[in-house]
Amino acid sequence: VLNQEYQIATIVNANSYTIEAKDTDGATVTANASDTGNGGSSVVGAYQINVGLDDYVSGFGFGSGYFGESSWGGGTSGFSSQLRLWSIDNFGEDMISNPRGGGLFYWDKTNGESTRSVNFSSLSGASDVPTIANQIIVSETDRHILALGANTIGTSTQDSMLVRWCNQEDAAMWTPKTTNTAGSIRLSAGSKIIGAVRTREEIIIFTDIALYAVQFIGPPFTFGVNLVTQSVSMVSPQAAINANNAIYFMDEDNFYIYEGGVQSLPCTVRAYVFDDFNYSQVYKVFAAKNAKFNEVTWFYCSSSSTEIDRYVTYNYLDKVWHIGNMDRTAWMDIGSSTDAPLAAGTNNYLYDHETGSNADGSAMTAFVESADFDAGDGNQFMFINRIIPDVLFYGSSTDPTVTYSIKTRNYPLGTLTTATTASVGSSTGVSNVRARARQMRVRVESTDEDNLWRLGDTRFDIRQDGRR
């Protein structure tokens, strides 16, 4: 009965705690009369890895820093405690993982799904395994495990710019010898490694001010390291992703692409994103891809939220951007284990994306809204009197419709008002409307269940209509 997982109920002292025993149905059980109270000599307790913090926390003042490091009454420099981030990779059929700033863990598939990951130091033949790292990643063509921001051999002190790697095909051997390929290198540009992304026959490592390209070159050096560029980085350890044979990444105030060199991505929503951005929770930013629709997406916290509540998406084929609100904390694209993108919400649920047209069985507000447009740089009023819609409906169980809304204002800082709306169905050829303003925008929207539609190139009958 006791061979289950338990949460600690009470702390007795520094060396003791209690749990509430339960049966396989979850009901509380008590000891029988013959129980001696010590559990016997064969009881083994295995502890889960500390889940860590779910927020970035910073502070200063009394109690921060070391005793005696400053004068009485003097302030101390700030301290920070980072939220828990994981890097996970495949090593053949096995899985390796690393909590940022923690140890290295290995899960062996042959031991079965019910077994736990174990520390690398417990592997057979383990030698000089890193005790701390900020990320681990496998070099795909040669099967070395790289530990970024690891401790140096013989110490427990983390070196935030040190890259260490194990012997080829040997996750346990980290001692460099003339007879193996284990080794290390310290990067020079920057003060810490932010993260890394694997791409075509190389690994791109981001420090806080630079990008490095790491390539397998074989003995005696094993890896060659080239500085790609300085003055750019990525905003968080998971803010870069490999998609369409390129790496797309978000920095503190812009978006970039790496294709052998680094270029900025022209972004029409840049001010919208970075003018309302919670930099105190910047490490929660992560990048995701949706290969089916040629998209990369960054999820981030707006300035008024400590949890992810927004996203910005770039379509790398059409070279267009769109924005929205959504709380997701992790994302997995279509692969061998799923036929739809799978994402995690802040409510501890996993969601299938791109499946159906409803939001978990309820109606979903789906819309496409343009930016403002004008005629003659806003010197002329516009008059619109006709819409020729281009909407494809499919898979709907009823007579589906969408609503076209024309929003207007006469001055850039004026209030947007909805001037006219038009309901459009599958048989609508043309819709007559009336709206006049210097600036307009168009919103196409549906709010009912089972309404799956796709927007094409809508045409509008617009003419200039004077200056006042």
What is the role of each PLM region?
Residues 2-84, 112-116, 124-127:
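Small/polar beta-strand repeat architecture
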Residues 9-15, 90-91, 111, 289-293:
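Short, ordered beta-strand-loop transition motifs
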Residues 51, 55-62, 66-67, 77-80, ...:
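Beta-sheet repeat architectures centered on beta-propellers
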Residues 58, 104-108, 151-177, 311-317, ...:
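Short beta-strand segments and strand-loop junctions that repeat across beta-rich extracellular domains
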Residues 68-81, 113-285:
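Beta-propeller and closely related beta-pinwheel folds
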Residues 93-107, 112-116:
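Hydrophobic or amphipathic alpha-helical targeting/insertion segments
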Residues 96-97, 203, 247, 341:
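Hydrophobic beta-strand segments that make up the repeating blades of beta-propeller
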